[in-house]
């Protein structure tokens, strides 16, 4: 009781800020993002300390901790605190010469971090520096950040604002180019605007109804990917694979699609291969089983207009205001995991489904429901809503576009960027992050449900190779014609 009164007095005299609706839903100590930076040089601890002191701690969320405000129904709030950057940078004392398999060690080390709840008594981030050479990098920085601080796109933008171009060490990284509307878009709107609004309205009603059915009772079919949210225990394993961005672009250009369509199609094909291997019986029997499965993913959708890297840099350098944090919606994406003779069918199905999601307002309605629930029913109701969504679907999926040119992070040239968000009750979280000519497939799996995450990762890589070969066959056929 005394502790509560002391905390009340502290909150009354300290500038506080409430959590955003999505941050409320992601406020559990077990919800965080683990990002791995592979560097081309050895890590310099002093460079990280100086760099963070000059940038990240000036971002409000990185210099605040989460506290319970007993004046407002026990809701969590952000409270600014003084901190020592050294306390958030961890350099483990390791005998690197005795480590026989560095790649496996890093995988185990990252997974171990993923299984430790966040220390909520201090600002919710930490850096682990490993001066260990692996097959992909000379050293690594593993960053653990609580998900309430920001979503994947926000954190990527903020980290880019701390980075500089390799070609020009004093220059900020350029924003990734946004898709421009055609010059005649206004005329197009005038011509088909009425029909388009009918489509938007109808599609939104249908997709929103499916969302609410999922919240209420509609669950995925029990399958080898689906965890058991009721047991409350998850043992995380984090693995990744690096694929060629050029291979993805080849498929994208040939099929006239978006990168996200290709990645979703590849995911569907990989999941189909993996699920097929988990069922006994002949090929025909397995095909029948896969046809009956309902497998869906909660796909994160960025709702924020493009934030300029310069604005984020100014926020950290000058303390200026910049909208930043968790501003994402979620759509329920039905995954096509049936056996297909034509591997390109997985890409076509992904595009058709995503096109339907794009013209619906499902993601905005999702965010609106969270905001409404928080205002009228409180944070506990928001957490319960999130548990229903994540507990009734099989996996989470997101894709974060990284820089197109090589950059350095606190004077360390980057070789690759990997990252996984560990949220919700799903046993499988799939995330893609691009960097220059690479795309990293990141899987965070609950090993109590999925015991062979590397097999699943390999199935996704193999699926991409099969789709690429089929695409090259399409190119050859078009050339012949």
From Swiss-Prot:
Induction: Up-regulated in the stem epidermis during active wax synthesis. Induced in roots during drought and salt stresses, and upon abscisic acid (ABA) treatment. The active site is at 147 (proton acceptor). It comes from the Eukaryota. Expressed in flowers, siliques, top parts of stems, and leaves. Not found in roots, seeds and young seedlings. The chain crosses the membrane at residues 186-206. One of its GO terms (cellular component) is endoplasmic reticulum membrane. One of its GO terms (molecular function) is long-chain-alcohol O-fatty-acyltransferase activity. Residues 207-481 are lumenal. Disruption phenotype: Severe reduction in wax alkyl esters. Reduced wax ester coverage on leaves and stems during normal and drought conditions leading to compromised growth and relative water content due to an increased leaf water loss, especially during drought. Residues 1-185 are cytoplasmic. In the N-terminal section; belongs to the long-chain O-acyltransferase family. Bifunctional wax ester synthase/diacylglycerol acyltransferase. Involved in cuticular wax biosynthesis. Required to reduce leaf water loss, especially during drought. This is Wax ester synthase/diacylglycerol acyltransferase 1. The lineage of its organism: Eukaryota, Viridiplantae, Streptophyta, Embryophyta, Tracheophyta. The gene is WSD1.
């Amino acid at each position: 009781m005394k502790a509560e009164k002391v905390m009340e007095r502290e909150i009354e005299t300290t500038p506080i800020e409430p959590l955003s609706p999505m941050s409320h839903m992601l406020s559990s100590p077990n919800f965080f993002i683990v990002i791995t930076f592979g560097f081309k040089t050895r890590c310099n601890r002093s460079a990280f300390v100086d760099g963070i002191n000059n940038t990240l701690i000036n971002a409000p969320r990185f210099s605040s901790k989460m506290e319970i405000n007993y004046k407002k129904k026990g809701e969590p709030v952000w409270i600014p605190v003084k901190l020592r950057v050294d306390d958030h940078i961890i350099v483990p004392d390791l005998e690197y010469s005795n480590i026989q398999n560095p790649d496996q060690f890093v995988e185990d080390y990252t997974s171990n971090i993923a299984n430790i709840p966040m220390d909520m008594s201090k600002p919710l981030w930490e850096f682990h520096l490993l001066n260990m050479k692996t097959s992909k990098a000379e050293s690594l920085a593993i960053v653990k950040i609580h998900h309430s601080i920001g979503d994947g796109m926000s954190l990527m933008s903020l980290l880019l604002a701390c980075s500089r171009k390799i070609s020009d060490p004093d220059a900020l990284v350029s924003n990734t180019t946004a898709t421009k509307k055609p010059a005649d878009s206004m005329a197009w709107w005038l011509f088909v605007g009425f029909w388009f609004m009918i489509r938007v309205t109808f599609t939104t009603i249908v997709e929103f109804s499916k969302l609410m059915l999922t919240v209420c009772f509609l669950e995925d079919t029990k399958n080898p990917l689906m965890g058991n949210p009721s047991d409350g225990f998850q043992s995380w394993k984090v693995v990744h694979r690096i694929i060629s961005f050029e291979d993805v672009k080849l498929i994208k250009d040939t099929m006239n699609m978006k990168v996200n369509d290709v990645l979703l199609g590849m995911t569907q094909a990989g999941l189909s291969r993996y699920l097929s291997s988990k069922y006994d019986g002949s090929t025909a029997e397995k095909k029948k089983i896969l046809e009956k499965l309902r497998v869906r993913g909660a796909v994160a959708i960025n709702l924020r207009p493009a934030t300029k890297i310069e604005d984020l840099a100014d926020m950290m350098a000058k303390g200026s205001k910049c909208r930043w944090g968790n501003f994402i919606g979620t759509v329920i994406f039905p995954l096509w995991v049936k056996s297909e003779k034509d591997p390109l069918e997985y890409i076509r199905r992904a595009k058709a489904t995503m096109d339907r999601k794009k013209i619906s307002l499902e993601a905005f309605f999702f965010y609106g429901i969270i905001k409404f629930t928080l205002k009228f029913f409180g944070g506990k109701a928001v957490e319960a809503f999130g548990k229903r969504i994540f507990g009734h679907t099989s996996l989470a999926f997101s894709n974060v576009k990284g820089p197109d040119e090589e950059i350095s992070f606190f004077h360390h040239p980057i070789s690759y960027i990997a990252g996984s968000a560990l949220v919700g009750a799903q046993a499988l979280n799939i995330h893609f992050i691009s960097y220059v000519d690479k795309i990293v497939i990141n899987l965070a799996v609950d090993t109590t449900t999925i015991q062979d995450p590397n097999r699943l990762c390999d199935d996704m890589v193999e699926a991409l190779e099969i789709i690429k070969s089929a695409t090259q066959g399409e190119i050859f056929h078009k050339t012949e014609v």
